[in-house]
Amino acid sequence: MSRRRHIFISHHHADDAHVSRLTQMLGRNSYEIRNSSIRAKPANQRRIDEGRISDQTLKRLLRMKMAWASTVVVLVGKNTHNRPWVDWEINKANQLGKRIVGVFERGGTDNDVPDAFKDYGDALVSWNSNNIIDAIEGRCDPFENPDGTPRQPDSNFPHTNCGGR
């Protein structure tokens, strides 16, 4: 039986392929993701890059899409930490009281974790479907290195590991 969750996937637009891989991987585990994040088509991305869509318009759209989601998943990959929109989305998720789960993309490193996630993240997991599902569901709040080994959270908030992981 498939489980369906409404989430917002915060990511750098260059990582759109990882968004598809994440939803496909979880789908193979009967976990259906309804992603409300923005995935800019080339024409829309060009309008954004040219400044034809204001930051206020983007923020309003992101707030509406994020409000619909129960959890915000942050894809942590190369250069994620340099993306101001990812930090904005994490801060907004915190203001909205959303659960914030970081997922290391394959090849992601500790240096790629955004500063806002270090302050507000609830869980940080490797690219492993069971760990990702447990973190989204809130069954546990693990903090893992990119290779899946345990690590200390960056914040002082209390966190619980999953079943001894």
Each language-model region and where it sits:
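Conserved beta-strand termini and adjacent loop/short-helix elements that scaffold enzyme active sites
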Residues: 34-38, 103, 127
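Conserved N-terminal substructure of TIR/SEFIR domains
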Residues: 1-68, 153-165
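C-terminal interaction surface of TIR/SEFIR-family domains
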Residues: 2-7, 21, 52-56, 107-165
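Short hydrophobic segments within beta-strands
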Residues: 10-12, 75, 103
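Short, structured coil segments at secondary-structure junctions
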Residues: 29, 96, 118-121
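Inter-motif core of Ras-like GTPase G domains
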Residues: 69-74
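A short helix->loop->beta-strand "cap" motif at the edges of active sites that frequently abuts
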Residues: 96-103
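Conserved TIR/SEFIR loop-to-helix hotspot centered on a Trp-containing motif
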Residues: 78-95
